[in-house]
């Protein structure tokens, strides 16, 4: 049976068909749906981990215990998991183990576009790259077999277009792979004397065998066409782009097993074509190795090294051809930057925080990163998961040295706090920093699509779980001053910020209100209520001062002709932030509907 599937769905299906029993992940675009789809298969135990390192380590534990396992994460998550990965690369596996890295060329939803293929080379492990959904499923099965055959974790490298594009997939049946009975092995105790032996084995055996396999496997295949004037080496979605523009005018060496590279096959292919192109997104990973082998090729000297590729780009840079462009007046196209949703509980907090002109606001990765956009213009920085608190701590130390009156405020969400914020908070406690650290608790992992976390009370399969209380954790870490506020009540927020900045030691402020898009649980309804309202503007009272507009709510719009503000009732949820900032009290409830949830 064939089914139209995204790459993420196909990876999940491949995990099921290959006999995987354990899967762990931390959500992050474009990888999130991999574990969400895996969780639909009862034969695979699946879990959201607090962060990528924990996901990797849990999958390692499952492998050591004898089961096939995987960990999935976006590209920057591999940085977090790298500590575990680079040592597990030495020890090898018992049950097959695959790490899925979902890279994001073009930065669709990421702070960088790092090329994680280099992790395979750094770790000296096998790497596989599918070019469509069928291969995503099939290659997952192959990856598990390669992992066990060569005693190596396997890096499955996919990109946004592979993850989210759909192609037809031929479905197969599940193969039940027995759990290997556990036996204690010295290789899993990598003290220096053991690791020396393991490293030697990698160089003298694993990589030698993987190179031989790379040259022999059908995962790396040649397609001869025409007069062989043009040869193309490519992998992943870039292969599809190359095929689209060159069709049968070129011959192809399609790389599916991309580390170690099949250098003998590449040399043979290159010797039989007149002009050799290496087409790959982002870094010249393949090109560098090919040129290092003394093979002449055309790559990044013509093909862009930044952002995504597409057929139009390749056609222009390689063939000198351009598709017709539809001309339009871009001045009439509205500028629509990303913004916090109407009713977002973060809006009121940042509106009040930004009023403190002496505040240095160190934000983090999540919806609240949008607080740096106009009109809020609140945050000063955002770096990586957990950095909000750490940067605030370091900055405050320097402000104090300089005799500045600047006050650092660290900001992160609830899921980020569980991810890597706890150690950052502990740093500010241990090293006596007078910072205000804020946790925006919207009761869910928001930006990636409402995944559960240790604070929500549910697992990925909807089973009840222990709720970890952020306030109690903060106290346990040594914070003496902890306060919880409703972020929709601006007077409370204003007073709480002032309170938090008054101490000469760390203080924690928790804003607690569910994401406006979240379907409320019974527990949420008991705590926050079960309602939805609509606000409206009284045109007789509105003076067009646009104080409400400065909150950045997309439900509000200003009419230049009438010089009045109106509210889109399809978006409004009556969070009342706009009503509270209106100096003329021109905004009030329109109707109350008992439909929330």
Model-inferred region functions:
Residues 34-37, 60, 81-85, 107-114, ...:
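Short acidic, glycine/serine/threonine-rich loops at helix termini
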Residues 43-50, 91-102, 180-188, 430-443, ...:
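A glycine-rich helix N-cap at a beta->alpha junction
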């Amino acid at each position: 049976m064939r089914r139209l599937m995204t790459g993420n769905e196909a990876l999940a299906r491949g995990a099921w068909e290959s006999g995987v029993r354990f899967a762990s992940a931390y959500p992050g675009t474009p990888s999130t749906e991999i574990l969400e789809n895996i969780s639909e298969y009862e034969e695979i135990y699946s879990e959201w981990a607090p962060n990528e390192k924990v996901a990797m380590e849990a999958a390692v534990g499952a492998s050591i215990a004898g089961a096939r396992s995987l960990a999935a994460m976006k590209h920057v998550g591999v940085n977090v998991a790298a500590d575990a990965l680079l040592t597990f690369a030495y020890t090898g596996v018992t049950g097959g183990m695959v790490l899925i890295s979902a890279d994001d060329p073009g930065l669709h939803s990421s702070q960088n576009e790092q090329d994680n293929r280099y992790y395979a080379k750094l770790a000296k492990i096998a790497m596989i790259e599918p070019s469509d959904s069928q291969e995503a499923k099939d290659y997952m099965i192959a990856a598990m077999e390669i992992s066990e055959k060569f005693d190596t974790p396997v890096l499955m490298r996919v990109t946004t277009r592979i993850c989210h594009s759909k192609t037809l997939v031929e479905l197969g049946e599940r193969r039940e792979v027995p759990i290997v009975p556990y036996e204690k092995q010295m290789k899993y105790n990598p003290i220096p004397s053991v690791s020396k032996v393991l490293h030697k084995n990698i160089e003298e055996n694993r990589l030698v065998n993987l190179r031989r396999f790379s040259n022999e496997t059908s995962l790396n295949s040649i397609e001869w066409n025409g007069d062989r004037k043009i040869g193309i080496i490519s992998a992943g979605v870039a292969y599809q782009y190359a095929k689209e523009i060159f069709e049968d005018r070129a011959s192809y060496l399609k790389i599916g097993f991309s580390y170690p590279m099949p250098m003998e096959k590449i040399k043979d292919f290159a010797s039989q074509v007149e002009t050799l192109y290496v087409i790959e997104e982002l870094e010249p990973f393949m090109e560098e190795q090919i040129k290092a082998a003394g093979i002449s090729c055309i790559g990044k000297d013509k093909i862009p090294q930044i952002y995504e590729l597409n057929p139009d780009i390749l056609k222009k840079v390689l063939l000198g051809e351009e598709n017709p462009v539809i001309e339009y007046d871009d001045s009439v196209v509205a500028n629509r930057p990303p913004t916090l949703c109407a009713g977002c509980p973060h809006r009121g907090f940042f509106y009040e925080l930004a009023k403190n002109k002496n505040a240095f606001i160190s934000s983090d990765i999540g919806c609240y990163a949008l607080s740096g956009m106009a009109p809020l213009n609140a945050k000063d920085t955002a770096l990586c998961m957990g950095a909000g608190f750490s940067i605030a701590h370091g900055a405050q130390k320097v402000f104090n040295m300089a005799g500045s009156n600047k006050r650092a405020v660290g900001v992160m969400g609830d899921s980020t706090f569980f991810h890597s914020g706890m150690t950052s908070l502990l740093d500010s406690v241990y090293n006596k920093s007078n910072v205000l650290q804020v946790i925006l608790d919207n009761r869910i992992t928001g930006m990636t699509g409402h995944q559960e976390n240790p604070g929500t009370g549910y697992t990925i399969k909807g089973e009840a779980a222990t709720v970890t209380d952020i306030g109690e954790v903060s106290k346990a870490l040594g914070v003496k001053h902890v306060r919880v506020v409703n972020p929709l009540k601006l007077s409370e927020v204003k007073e709480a910020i002032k309170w938090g900045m008054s101490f000469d030691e760390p203080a924690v402020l928790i804003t607690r209100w569910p994401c406006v898009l979240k379907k409320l649980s019974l527990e949420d309804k008991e705590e926050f209520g079960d309602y939805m309202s609509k606000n409206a503007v009284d045109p007789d009272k509105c003076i067009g001062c646009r104080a409400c507009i400065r909150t950045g709510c997309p439900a509000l719009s200003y009419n230049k002709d009438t010089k009045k503000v109106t509210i889109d009732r399809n978006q409004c949820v009556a969070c009342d932030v706009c009503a509270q900032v209106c100096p003329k009290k021109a905004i009030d409830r329109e109707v109350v509907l008992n439909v929330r949830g």
